[in-house]
Amino acid sequence: QNLQGAINGEMYEINEMYATFLETAKLQGEKGAQLSFFYALAAEKTHAALFQKTKQTLDSTKKDVPLGPIQICDVCGWTTEGDIPDKCPICGAKRDQFQTFA
């Protein structure tokens, strides 16, 4: 139930909130805001995917979901499980610009 609420929140942010913010920034010619909202939108998509994967695993196994280390890009917020990538696929940040949560 909590995971579904989190997924719903992420989907709202993806489909409504950041999409609207990004379009408004484009219309106003705000390049910095466009980049920030682009990064936020991309990060929210990864968050939604992680929540959906976790919910599917939990629904099918009825057990706690083991997670490896979580890596978060300090520049754009892109999030992934496992090893730190050489560079962020969203913003190109180098691996030393990631935070690890184990």
Predicted feature residues:
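Non-heme di-metal
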Residues: 1-102
